[in-house]
Amino acid sequence: MIKINEHFLKLQSSYLFSEIAKRVNAHQATHPDQSIIKLGIGDATQPLCPACLDAFHKAVDEMGTASSFRGYGPEQGYAFLREAVAANDYQARGADIQPDEVFISDGAKCDTGNFQELFATDIRVAIPDPVYPVYLDTNVMAGRTGAFENGRYGNIVYMECTAQNSFLPAIPKEPADLVYLCFPNNPTGAVATKEYLQAWVDWALDAKALILFDAAYEAFIRDPSIPKTIYEIPGARKVAVEFRSFSKTAGFTGTRCAFSVVPKECMAYDTSGKAHALHALWNRRHCTKFNGVSYPVQRAAEAVYSPEGKAQAKEMIRTYMANADRITAAMAGMGFSYVGGDHSPYIWVDTKTDSWAFFDTLLTKAGVVCTPGGGFGKCGAQYIRLSAFNSYANVDAAMKRMAEVFGKA
């Protein structure tokens, strides 16, 4: 008799964004004439940068002739892209990251979800609340949690992020082996200072713990004093793995390209206490389960680092941040408290009511889709996340609709 992994049964019935889509589709079926403006899921809406598109076309043409055709590529990524990532995203900021420490993949979601496979099932995991659901759900699937009761799983260290601590998770007082951090944060939009991250690195060094650092939204940081990578922090190479994506920085949500950075001195330990390099373990896992990102996509990603690509990507970010500015101004005008939107495409809005109820009200009365904060954890129960990923015209229209429903302060 074939048996299932019963840990899957502990998962909540529906992935957050699937539930949102279900409710939106049901509403549209009964209100076909109402236009819907989606400020929910963080999907890019601007087209690929022209520099990326040109490189993409050229690489596709190369695949059409025998002399330049490419078959299977290196699982870890082509050297040209790994070198561009290391030089531009890390070495240019004084971070000592080498090309062979960069692993190209098809998404940060996949990497953040898969990296936990390297660790024992009896480790203690610390996760922020609210949190991007993938961090938690993949550890549930792996069997690291207890049952789901009163809105939380057993055996997880929940780090509450509230207005009282500026939505910055505090170092846990109880033991933890694996910690997930995301800055600029999804969903709250909060950012971390160098001093704050240094405290985390120092803690991890002392505890022999590991930080999984999601920096997918670093391109939205507008203050040069805010770190864009955890490797700007002394000691981080020993205790942190970083994940990034081209999805939001260059519009690759439908094209799929990202990368993880695993420094060679970053260690984890066996039951005898012997240290093992995570770089070697991740390389083994990566080569076993992944066949690499396609050559044309990697050439398109490489073009992000060209002078033209950098300028075009910055303009794309500027467009989204203009949307964020419009949203934050509207929230202030309507009297809502919020965080984010200054260095992030996400705005975390305090609704003072149940987030799913607010979602339904916003959808039915204004035709605007948000993301209910309750889907990110108990601490998000009265918040919604608004996304700046749309056209300015749509964002402006959505804010006007919201003002009609909720009024102006």
UniProtKB/Swiss-Prot annotation:
The modification N6-(pyridoxal phosphate)lysine is found at K248. Keywords: Aminotransferase, Pyridoxal phosphate, Transferase. It is an enzyme of class 2 (transferase). It catalyses: (2S,6S)-2,6-diaminopimelate + 2-oxoglutarate = (S)-2,3,4,5-tetrahydrodipicolinate + L-glutamate + H2O + H(+). Transmembrane segments: none annotated. It comes from the Bacteria. GO terms for molecular function: L,L-diaminopimelate aminotransferase activity; pyridoxal phosphate binding. Its EC number is 2.6.1.83. InterPro entries: Aminotransferase_I/II_large, DapL/ALD1, PyrdxlP-dep_Trfase, PyrdxlP-dep_Trfase_major, PyrdxlP-dep_Trfase_small. GO terms for biological process: lysine biosynthetic process via diaminopimelate. Its cofactor is pyridoxal 5'-phosphate. Pyridoxal 5'-phosphate binds at Y72, A108, K109, Y132, N186, Y217, S245, F246, S247, R256, N291. Pfam families: Aminotran_1_2 (PF00155). Pathway: Amino-acid biosynthesis; L-lysine biosynthesis via DAP pathway; LL-2,6-diaminopimelate from (S)-tetrahydrodipicolinate (aminotransferase route): step 1/1. Substrate binds at Y15, G42, K109, Y132, N186, N291, R385. Homodimer. Belongs to the class-I pyridoxal-phosphate-dependent aminotransferase family. LL-diaminopimelate aminotransferase subfamily. Involved in the synthesis of meso-diaminopimelate (m-DAP or DL-DAP), required for both lysine and peptidoglycan biosynthesis. Catalyzes the direct conversion of tetrahydrodipicolinate to LL-diaminopimelate. PANTHER family: AMINOTRANSFERASE. This is LL-diaminopimelate aminotransferase. It comes from Desulfosudis oleivorans (strain DSM 6200 / JCM 39069 / Hxd3) (Desulfococcus oleovorans).
